[in-house]
From Swiss-Prot:
InterPro entries: aa-tRNA-synth_II, aa-tRNA-synth_II/BPL/LPL, Phe-tRNA_ligase_II_N, Phe_tRNA_ligase_alpha1_bac, Phenylalanyl-tRNA_Synthase, tRNA-bd_arm. It comes from the Bacteria. GO terms for biological process: phenylalanyl-tRNA aminoacylation. Its EC number is 6.1.1.20. One of its GO terms (cellular component) is cytoplasm. Its cofactor is Mg(2+). The lineage of its organism: Bacteria, Bacillati, Bacillota, Bacilli, Lactobacillales. Keywords: Aminoacyl-tRNA synthetase, ATP-binding, Cytoplasm, Ligase, Magnesium, Metal-binding, Nucleotide-binding, Protein biosynthesis. SUPFAM superfamilies: Class II aaRS and biotin synthetases, tRNA-binding arm. This is Phenylalanine--tRNA ligase alpha subunit. It comes from Lactiplantibacillus plantarum (strain ATCC BAA-793 / NCIMB 8826 / WCFS1) (Lactobacillus plantarum). It catalyses: tRNA(Phe) + L-phenylalanine + ATP = L-phenylalanyl-tRNA(Phe) + AMP + diphosphate + H(+). Coiled coil: none annotated.
Length: 348
């Protein structure tokens, strides 16, 4: 058999082996077997030394042609197998877009956040501006500007977290009132602000007390403001949160920064006003405190109490949540038990 015939035989056999190779490993093995240093094509090339000078160039050119043809077939088959592997992987990872999606568990607003948001929406609809005050406050704004002199019992160290002698964690969102009064331009209309936020007291945590809780303070100042305006606002708040079926009453009380002062009660949720242990047989439950802004508070902000008046009210979203949903321990709101909190979530 001539060298050219041997090369043709090796070419045909190699192309057949390449075509039948179904994995890259087999393709690579064909390359080593045919084109390697110890392969048959290399052996044929070594035999060219026995050829005549006239035959040697022809056989050499044909040998290169065979080698190039085999290498091209190897490259082509390798590319086919690599693409097939990619296609197989893509098919395995293919998503059926017609299948229903898997619902991802979502978080939800905390029950107290829901109540705060509900009240913010209510009051913004009435023209109030939402004010976010500082939780770290000056003693001057937290107490003195609210008609709480230095010897007032509420300023005792056991009730307040002091950071320095003159700086503290605010005990009430009422501390936002003085700054609102100072900064408002009454030539542009009445002052109507709502101040929600966290406040701090040196209380021992129990079923009804917490060292950190929430307050919402409302303040309205304008000419010709009366107690009737305050009463109408409080009734609207109570009925929005608790429902129209509950009555609201005002009774006299005392707060240093309002005069006169009142407390608002609503019909007991548990007994519908008949009297029970929860309402201490009165048929009423206290929900918030309020009153007409004290003239001295207005004067300290440079406002003439003879020309302007106003009302203020403060309520606790934590307490509202306890009353509205019948929760008997305020600490339950802060244990982060999703099973407990999820029952209060209102969609939409």
């Amino acid at each position: 058999m001539s060298l050219q015939d041997r090369l043709t035989e090796l070419r045909d056999q190699g192309l057949a082996d390449i075509k039948s190779a179904d994995v890259l490993k087999k393709v690579n093995q064909v390359k080593v077997d045919l084109l390697g240093k110890k392969g048959p094509i290399t052996e044929v090339l070594r035999g060219m030394r026995d050829l005549s000078p006239e035959e040697r160039p022809k056989v050499g050119a044909y040998a290169n042609e065979v080698r190039d043809r085999i290498q091209a077939a190897i490259d082509e088959r390798r590319e086919e197998l690599e693409q097939a592997a990619v296609n197989e992987q893509l098919a395995a990872e293919k998503l059926d877009v017609t299948l229903p999606g898997r619902e991802v568990p979502q978080g939800q607003p905390h029950v107290i956040t829901q109540i705060i948001t509900e009240l913010e929406d209510l009051f913004m609809g009435m023209g109030y501006q939402i004010v976010d005050g500082d939780e770290v406050e000056e003693d001057y704004y937290n107490f003195e500007r609210l008609n709480l002199p230095k010897d007032h019992p509420a300023r005792d160290m056991q009730d307040t977290f002091y950071i320095t002698k003159d700086v503290l964690l605010r005990t009430q969102t009422s501390a936002d009132q003085p700054r609102s009064l100072e900064n408002h331009d009454f030539s542009k209309g009445p002052l109507k602000v709502l101040s929600p936020g966290r406040v701090y007291r040196r209380d021992t945590d129990d079923a009804t007390h917490s060292h950190q809780f929430h307050q919402i303070e409302g303040l309205v100042v304008d000419k010709h403001i009366t107690m009737a305006d305050l009463k109408g606002t409080l009734i609207l708040v109570a009925k929005t949160l608790f429902g129209d079926q509950f009555d609201v009453r005002l009774r006299p009380s005392f707060f240093p920064f309002t005069e006169p002062s009142v407390e608002a009660d609503v019909t007991c949720f548990n007994c519908n006003g008949k009297g029970c242990a929860i309402c201490k047989q009165t048929g009423w439950i206290e929900v918030l405190g309020a009153g007409m802004v004290h003239p001295h508070v207005l004067e300290m902000s440079g406002i003439d109490p003879e020309e302007y008046g106003g009302f203020a009210f403060g309520l606790g979203p934590d307490r509202f949540a306890m009353l509205k949903y019948g929760v008997d321990d305020i600490r339950n709101f802060y244990l982060n038990d999703v099973r407990f909190l999820s029952q209060f979530y209102k969609k939409g």
